[in-house]
Swiss-Prot record:
Major glycoprotein, comprises over 80% of the envelope proteins present in virus particle. Homotrimer of disulfide-linked HA1-HA2. Its main location: virion. It is found in: Virion membrane; Host apical cell membrane. InterPro entries: Capsid_hemagglutn, Hemagglutn_HA1_a/b_dom_sf, Hemagglutn_influenz_A/B. One of its GO terms (molecular function) is host cell surface receptor binding. The keyword Lipoprotein applies. Residues 1-15 form the signal peptide. It comes from the Viruses. One of its GO terms (biological process) is virion attachment to host cell. It comes from Influenza B virus (strain B/Hong Kong/9/1989). This is Hemagglutinin.
Amino acid sequence: MKAIIVLLMVVTSNADRICTGITSSNSPHVVKTATQGEVNVTGVIPLTTTPTKSHFANLKGTKTRGKLCPNCLNCTDLDVALARPMCMGTIPSAKASILHEVRPVTSGCFPIMHDRTKIIQLPNLLRGYENIRLSTHNVINAERAPGGPYRLGTSGSCPNVTSRSGFFATMAWAVPRDNKTATNPLTVEVPYICTKGEDQITVWGFHSDSKTQMKNLYGDSNPQKFTSSANGVTTHYVSQIGDFPNQTEDGGLPQSGRIVVDYMVQKPGKSGTIVYQRGVLLPQKVWCASGRSKVIKGSLPLIGEADCLHEKYGGLNKSKPYYTGEHAKAIGNCPIWVKTPLKLANGTKYRPPAKLLKER
């Protein structure tokens, strides 16, 4: 019986047989795995997209601010931040803001020496707040400030709704009425006047001109000293006296003088101080700001809505979880940047089709 069984097994093993296995069509999909390197699979889902540049848009689900004051026509953001006459309007609240003025921008009314201070940063500082409003009252009585009485200087390049001459609402140009003499440093306290626990942004500065003009206006042609202090930050300045070339700002009148403008941030309940001599621009209306707004570099106008705002690509809608291309700051519901495309294998590992084998 055992011999017969062995014989049967030999006969069976020599017979033709079919080997079966997993079969599939030829696969063009290759994925790179962490453990097996490149592997052919039967199917993949792309996880990345490469965006193309588009216009900027409003961020879905939130308010987006382009210009600080959209209704202030023919006004730069610096005009609005300094409260230039004819550039005073409501700044809308926003959770996201577009930094669209990428170069230092001058403001009308008076030539500003931008390189002396951080004043060109003021519009960006304001953009970083969700809620921004200009106080209805002046922070100090400039006409009766120490060293006065003063008359408040104006510029023919700053017309307002009632007069052909004016000045920034955030500052008062303090020109001595009768006591046009040199003075030792004077100190004025700047109180906190915001009413809702906001940060108070107080703008101030000083005026410089030729020796002749300084003598005529203030009774002192020497360089003047100025200091501001608030929130633990102290800044010192010395005015520059000289014959500046006439300069015209925003189609205004030619002016030989220059102003240096700065600001200080006062926290709730905290006062600040300004120490000054002749030519001071005393603070008046202040900005009261609260909340946080995300800021991103971009351009105007804002057209439509988008899931994400990207500095290089503009408005993006999130069609894939990842993107390739230029890596830059982005805000909103944004895809994640990756260096190379990612794919999700949604099929099996590819195996060659099974073959009919004939054993001999």
